[in-house]
Amino acid sequence: MMGVDIANIITMVLAILFVSTERVTNTLQLSLQLTPNRARYLAAKLCVFLLVTVGVSLVSVCFAALCGRWVLGMMGVELPSLASPEVLQLLGGLLVLGPAHAVLGFACAVTFHSGLLAFLVVFFIMCLPSLASLLPGDLERGVSSLLFMPAIHSLAGTIAPDGVGYTPPALALGVIAVWVVVLCGIAVTSFQRQDL
């Protein structure tokens, strides 16, 4: 999974750079002259980047799965079938991880006009479960189940059903969708109000 995590961090940083370089190179005004509808412009830009991110996630997850199976097989570890529900859940969750991080990076870069600030905000979102762990037991469980990272890990099956932050996979997908929709909504609203 380390390779997948590295690929996800790279795609998140690339999403931030994908947005912020237009500001630095002053090509944003030209792009908006060609596509005056700002919401459509952002949606098209996000779709292009998501296609690339899905491809990168697919390659990194397949590569990590095959390399992991090869290494563990050489060590004599008995491995479950790739078609087993647990493995499919893990691979599916890992496939969602890259595009979800890319959308967070993209939305934060649009909202905050700064690549560094966008990275820090996404990093803060990723660290929220650690902050939630400071809360008392039941409150921690409740808050953690609404956070982005525990939802991703629940979707991938890496949190035990009785673990802190666990959300059933279908509900976890909903939590991820809410985070993405809210952050993208904030980004579109912010972008439409900007004086460029």
Outline where the language-model segments fall.
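Residues that define the loop-to-transmembrane-helix transition and helix capping
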Residues: 39, 116-117
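Transmembrane helix boundary and interhelical loop/hinge segments in multi-pass membrane proteins
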Residues: 13-34, 38-39, 46
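Membrane-interface elements of multi-pass transporters and channels
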Residues: 66-78, 111, 115, 135-143, ...
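Hydrophobic alpha-helical transmembrane segments of integral membrane proteins
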Residues: 32, 38-62, 127-153
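Terminal transmembrane helical anchor/hairpin motif
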Residues: 119-193
